[in-house]
Amino acid sequence: MISLTDTQKIGMGLTGFGVFFLFFGMILFFDKALLAIGNVLFVAGLAFVIGLERTFRFFFQRHKVKATGFFLGGVFVVLIGWPLIGMIFEIYGFFLLFRGFFPVVVGFIRRVPVLGSLLNLPGIRSFVDKVGESNNMV
């Protein structure tokens, strides 16, 4: 089992609550207060889990400037009160930022008994194969 420090445990909790508030905010027709809270908790939790310096290094790498701009710009747009437009920017930036992790995530989910069989359904399989293929070396 992986050993986590207390700071990392707090970060996991903040990230989990952030994802919950983002999901709940989208279910409730893009409620701007819930989305704003979710954004702040998610970014703060990420900083707690991997550390502040590594978070800055991750977001501000030269080849991720466009992705970071869209993601943080989307967070800002949500915070000023345009949740739908902000979430579109944010989701696009999220996919650009974390696209290197998608093959690993898809490979892991395919090994989970119930979810793996769901990913092999005809309509879903082609989409998952596209998402799960690695275009570049990470």
UniProtKB/Swiss-Prot annotation:
Q: What InterPro entries does this protein's entry cite?
A: Got1, Vesicle_transpt_Got1/SFT2
Q: Which residues lie on this side of the membrane: Cytoplasmic?
A: 1-9, 54-68, 110-138
Main localization of the protein described in the UniProt heading: Golgi
Which stretches face the Lumenal side? 31-32, 90
Its record classes its membrane topology as: Multi-pass membrane protein
Record's Pfam families? Got1
Alphabetical keyword list: Acetylation, Golgi apparatus, Membrane, Protein transport, Transmembrane, Transmembrane helix, Transport
Looking at the UniProt entry, the stretches that span the membrane are 10-30, 33-53, 91-109
Q: Which GO terms describe its biological process?
A: endoplasmic reticulum to Golgi vesicle-mediated transport; protein transport; retrograde transport, endosome to Golgi
One GO CC term on file: Golgi membrane
- Role summary: May be involved in fusion of ER-derived transport vesicles with the Golgi complex.
Q: What is this protein called?
A: Vesicle transport protein GOT1B
Q: Which organism is it from?
A: Mus musculus
